[in-house]
């Protein structure tokens, strides 16, 4: 995209009723009195962030029956709208065995009002999920959870990020 700008300045000569007018000129072109055009190159970057909190079921220790609440945010750090946004959430126990979320990830909202699957430039969408700790998962002493997000630009370029890799793409 681009932004085009042109200004017309008008002033009166002091002590007279005569107007003086001049139209702005882009100094980078040979044409006289033409618009100044600034080209804006499209770029697409998303960042996935995930936080977790545990709701203890009353025994004071993290373990079987407790709920791990996940909040996943996906921020469009680029300057183009992204569509087709999907969230993938991989959950494993301490031995690498696959686990399934008890719920989610589910779309909670976006700070600029977009619906699920769309991110405007600069917009952040929030997703929620939770996992109820099972005896088998607790026996491995840890639960590993990674979220990834994938979306598409208008030109069908793929944009993705993983919540724990430190690299926004």
Predicted regions and their residues:
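Exported/extracytosolic protein signature
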Residues: 1-169
């Amino acid at each position: 995209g681009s932004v085009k700008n042109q200004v017309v300045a008008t002033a009166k000569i002091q002590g007279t009723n005569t107007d003086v007018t001049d139209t702005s000129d882009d100094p980078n072109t040979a044409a006289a009195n033409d618009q100044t055009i600034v080209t804006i190159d499209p770029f697409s970057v998303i960042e996935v962030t995930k936080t977790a909190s545990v709701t203890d079921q009353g025994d004071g220790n993290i373990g079987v029956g407790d709920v791990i609440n996940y909040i996943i945010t996906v921020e469009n750090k680029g300057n183009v709208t992204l569509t087709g946004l999907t969230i993938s959430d991989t959950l494993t126990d301490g031995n690498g065995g696959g686990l399934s979320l008890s719920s989610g990830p589910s779309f909670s909202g976006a700070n600029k009002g977009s619906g699920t699957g769309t991110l405007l430039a600069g917009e952040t969408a929030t997703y929620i999920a939770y996992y109820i700790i099972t005896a088998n998962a607790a026996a491995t002493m840890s639960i590993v959870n990674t979220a990834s997000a994938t979306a598409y630009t208008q030109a069908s370029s793929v944009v993705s990020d993983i919540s724990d890799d430190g690299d926004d793409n």
